[in-house]
Swiss-Prot record:
It comes from Brucella canis (strain ATCC 23365 / NCTC 10854 / RM-666). CDD domains: Ribosomal_L1. This is Large ribosomal subunit protein uL1. Gene3D superfamilies: 3.30.190.20, 3.40.50.790. GO terms for cellular component: cytosolic large ribosomal subunit.
C-alpha cells in the first residue's frame, strides 16, 4: 500500500490540479509522469454543455487522427460474397455473416471495431444488446455501415476514433501513446477537439466545451486551457 501511495504522489508531484495548462505544457507533464512499465495510452476527456438524455443533444462522430492511435485495432466485418472478399483483402481480422452472428451472439467478442454492409443490418441489428453497450454497433453516421468496406477497414486500422458523449456529458478517447513525440500528440488532440466541435448539436445552448483534460493510462489528469486546443464556441 505504501508503494502505491508513493507512486501516486510521484505522479501528482508538480501538477497543479487547479491550473489550466496550455496544451504543449500539459502534454509534457503527462509524458513526464507516465511511469508504468508499458507504453501508456494518452487519453483526452472533454466535458460538454449538453444533456445526452435528449436525442437532439447527442454528440457522436468519428475522426481520423493524423498520427494514428498507436494501438492495433482488430476489425470485424459482417458481409457476404464480393464484399466479404474485399474486407479480407483490406485486412479485416474477422469476416462473416450468419456464422459470425452466432459467435458474437454467444458473447465472444474478439475485435475492437465492427463494420457491416447495409444488407447485413437486419441480422446485425439483433446484436444490439451485445454490441450496443460496448459502443460497437455499426452506424452509418460514423461510417461503419457502408458498401465501401475496404475504405472502412483501412480507416479503422489507420487511426479512426469514434466518439460518443456519455450520460454525464463527457467524451473520452485515446488519442495516442506516451511514446509519440509531443508534436504528434498535439496534432492528434487538436484533430479530435476540432471533430467534437464540428459535431456540436444545434440544440446545445450556452458554453459547449466546459473543461478539457488529458492523462496517461495510469497517470493523473492535467487540466488544459480549452483555447489552446482550438476550442472556440
Amino acid at each position: 500500500m505504501a508503494k502505491i501511495s508513493k507512486r501516486i504522489n510521484k505522479i501528482r508531484e508538480g501538477v497543479d490540479r487547479n491550473k489550466l495548462y496550455d496544451l504543449s505544457a500539459a502534454i509534457g507533464l503527462v509524458k513526464e509522469r507516465a511511469v508504468a512499465k508499458f507504453d501508456e495510452t494518452v487519453e483526452i476527456a472533454m466535458n460538454l454543455g449538453v444533456d445526452p438524455r435528449h436525442a437532439d443533444q447527442m454528440v457522436r462522430g468519428v475522426v481520423n487522427l493524423p498520427n494514428g492511435t498507436g494501438r492495433t485495432v482488430r476489425v470485424a466485418v459482417f458481409a457476404r460474397g464480393d464484399k466479404a472478399e474485399e474486407a479480407k483483402k483490406a485486412g479485416a481480422d474477422i469476416v462473416g455473416a450468419e456464422e459470425l452472428f452466432e459467435i458474437v451472439n454467444g458473447g465472444k467478442i474478439e475485435f475492437d471495431r465492427c463494420i457491416a454492409t447495409p444488407d447485413m443490418m437486419p441480422l446485425v441489428g439483433r446484436l444490439g444488446k451485445v454490441l450496443g453497450p460496448r459502443g460497437m454497433m455499426p452506424n452509418p453516421k460514423v461510417g461503419t455501415v457502408t458498401t465501401d468496406v475496404a475504405a472502412a477497414v483501412a480507416a479503422s486500422k489507420g487511426g479512426a476514433v469514434e466518439f460518443r458523449v456519455e450520460k454525464a456529458g463527457i467524451i473520452h478517447a485515446g488519442i495516442g501513446k506516451v511514446s509519440f513525440d509531443n508534436a504528434k500528440l498535439e496534432e492528434n488532440i487538436k484533430a479530435f477537439a476540432d471533430a467534437v466541435i464540428k459535431a456540436k448539436p444545434s440544440a446545445a445552448k450556452g458554453e459547449y466545451v466546459k473543461r478539457v483534460s488529458i492523462s496517461s493510462t495510469m497517470g493523473v489528469g492535467v487540466k488544459v486551457d480549452p483555447s489552446t486546443v482550438k476550442v472556440v464556441d
